[in-house]
């Protein structure tokens, strides 16, 4: 199983590969999904419903149905406060936001839109929800972010954040998904809607300055003084995303030497280098997508980027270039749990470290040395929301370059991923310690081992994906992996006992995890070795053989 790199990866996209925005938006309004076709139904994945108008998987009917379903959920749960509505810069986000507002206004929901129709990062919406709900038991707020995250320009996405401020959990998304599909099957009978112009004038439609509310609070989570006093030269590439105007405001408010590489917003994302597979993808953890910033890394002491809704980060140092996501997570954990005295002063119990089952084992070793509890969850940031809100978790991070952490005083910051705060933390680390995160990770690797890791994927039918998700330890008959005895086989996360949607196999010197993709006909294998690259290759090869054998077996 090898990942085929596209010959144009890392290079500008030819004009022929750019989307026709007008045609895409026209398809959004004109094409009607068929709910008898599985691919055209509402389906919430790891974070929201995603699809493309070209495929009839993200069209106006989907958004109308999902929004009405969210209203029904709010009503059933007694959620009576405002709904914070944010969007990113994908071509389908603005029309989908308009559709959602038409339904919300028709149903009498107080909606908070951004002033001047400013783009709205996911963390700014999470921050707004938590700020409103602080100290309240009634009139609680929730939110919607219209974003497909780092997905290609042809895609749209729609995700719901309940009153805890983070991504909705499975119980909620299953309820909304079922209700939305019922409405689709009824050809939108039961969906209330008013024209956009009327919705914008409605007494329930309000404007909020998300940008200044969020930027004004950033000093409560990041030590801006130490960054400014160190006179760090910083660079940021917003990748044409929702935080594109936030960075200049941050630099001005906190008087930082922060250069914004580009503030261009283009729904074709023509400025993006192609990703590994030849697609345009605003992924700040991809060395191909990040080529523009990596090429000028020597101009800055530290540089960073965020994806389209600014919930994910990418860190670039002069010596290393783009850091692997797990490398930065480890450096961030090591720093935070030694430089946040306010956490110990204000939290009743020591804050724990949250990671997913596919994140590096180096984090386990580091956390143990720090004397902190490790809470290992399934993939999906929704699993961390409650722990972040309560202060049980001081930090939560995913190997896909998503993380957030508590404010400096130990109170909750966001319960969704925050690429802006994670990016700025890299500057605080550099300023306070004199070593950038790449250098700090090198020291951690010297102390705890220098793992090599990789994520690859392979084709799988819908039935095989179901079988993989349903695997249990008894279906894995192998006793060894890459020359080592298998120590444990997991299909539930140690941190909460929830299914991981696949399988994880551990040995003394490495591990692999396999899980089906939520959106494509393939499965993913994550692997790590603390021995060497040859050992990693053996793990990957044997992992695919183990998984292929397991998913080809007849199930009783």
In which residue ranges do the predicted regions lie?
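Flexible hinge/switch segments at interdomain interfaces of large molecular machines
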Residues: 36-46, 191-195, 261-268, 518-519
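Flexible glycine-/small-residue-enriched beta->alpha junction loops
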Residues: 138-194, 497
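Catalytic-core signal marking the mid-to-C-terminal active-site face
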Residues: 435-556
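Ferredoxin-reductase
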Residues: 2-14, 78-164, 364
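Phosphate-binding chemistry for phosphorylated carbohydrates and sugar-nucleotides
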Residues: 15-18, 23, 27-30, 110-126, ...
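An N-terminal, well-structured beta->alpha segment
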Residues: 2-106, 200-234, 242
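Short beta-strand segments
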Residues: 86, 143-149, 305-307, 396-397, ...
């Amino acid at each position: 199983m090898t990942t085929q790199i596209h010959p144009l990866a890392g290079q500008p996209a030819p004009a022929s590969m750019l989307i026709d925005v007008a045609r895409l938006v026209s398809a959004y309004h004109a094409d009607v999904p068929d709910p008898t076709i599985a691919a055209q139904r509402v389906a919430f994945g790891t974070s929201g419903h995603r699809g493309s108008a070209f495929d009839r998987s993200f069209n106006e009917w989907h958004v109308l149905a999902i929004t009405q379903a969210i209203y029904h959920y709010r009503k059933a749960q007694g959620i009576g406060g405002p709904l914070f509505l944010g969007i990113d810069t994908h071509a389908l986000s603005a029309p989908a936001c308009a559709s959602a507002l038409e339904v919300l206004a028709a149903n009498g929901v107080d909606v908070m839109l951004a002033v001047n129709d400013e783009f709205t990062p996911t963390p700014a919406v999470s921050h707004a929800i938590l700020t409103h709900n602080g100290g309240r038991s009634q009139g609680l707020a929730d939110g919607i972010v219209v974003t497909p995250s780092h997905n290609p320009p042809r895609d749209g996405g729609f995700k719901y954040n309940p009153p805890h401020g983070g991504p909705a959990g499975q119980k909620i998304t299953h309820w909304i998904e079922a209700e939305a599909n019922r409405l689709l099957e009824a050809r939108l009978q039961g969906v209330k809607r008013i024209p956009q112009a009327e919705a914008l004038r409605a007494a329930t439609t309000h404007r909020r300055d998300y940008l200044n509310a969020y930027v004004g609070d950033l000093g409560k989570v990041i030590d801006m003084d130490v960054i400014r006093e160190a006179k760090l030269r910083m660079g940021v590439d917003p990748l044409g995303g929702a935080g594109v105007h936030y960075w200049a405001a941050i630099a001005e408010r906190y008087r930082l030497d922060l250069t914004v590489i580009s503030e261009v917003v283009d729904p074709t994302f023509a400025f993006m280098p192609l990703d590994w597979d030849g697609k345009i993808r605003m992924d700040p953890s991809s060395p191909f997508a990040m080529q523009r910033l990596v090429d000028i890394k020597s101009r800055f002491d530290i540089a960073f980027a965020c994806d389209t809704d600014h919930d994910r980060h990418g860190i670039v140092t002069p010596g290393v270039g783009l850091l692997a996501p797990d490398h930065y997570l480890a450096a961030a954990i090591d720093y935070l749990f030694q430089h946040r005295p306010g956490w110990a002063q204000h939290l009743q119990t020591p804050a724990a470290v949250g990671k997913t089952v596919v994140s590096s084992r180096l984090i386990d070793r580091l956390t143990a040395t720090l004397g902190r509890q490790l809470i290992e969850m399934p993939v999906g940031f929704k699993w961390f929301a409650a722990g972040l809100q309560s202060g049980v978790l001081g930090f939560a991070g995913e190997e896909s370059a998503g993380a957030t952490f508590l404010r400096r005083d130990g109170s909750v910051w966001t319960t969704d991923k925050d690429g802006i705060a994670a990016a700025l933390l890299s500057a605080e680390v550099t300023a306070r310690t004199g070593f950038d995160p790449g250098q700090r990770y090198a020291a951690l690797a010297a102390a705890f081992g220098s793992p090599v890791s990789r994520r690859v994927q392979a084709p799988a039918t819908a039935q095989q994906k179901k079988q993989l998700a349903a695997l249990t330890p008894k279906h894995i008959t192998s006793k060894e992996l890459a020359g080592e005895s298998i120590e444990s086989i997991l299909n539930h996360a140690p941190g909460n006992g929830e299914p991981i949607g696949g399988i994880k196999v551990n040995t003394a010197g490495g591990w692999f995890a396999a899980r089906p993709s939520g959106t494509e006909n393939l499965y993913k294998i994550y692997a790590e070795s603390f021995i060497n690259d040859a050992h990693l290759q053996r793990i990957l090869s044997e992992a695919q053989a183990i998984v292929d054998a397991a998913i080809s077996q007849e199930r009783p």
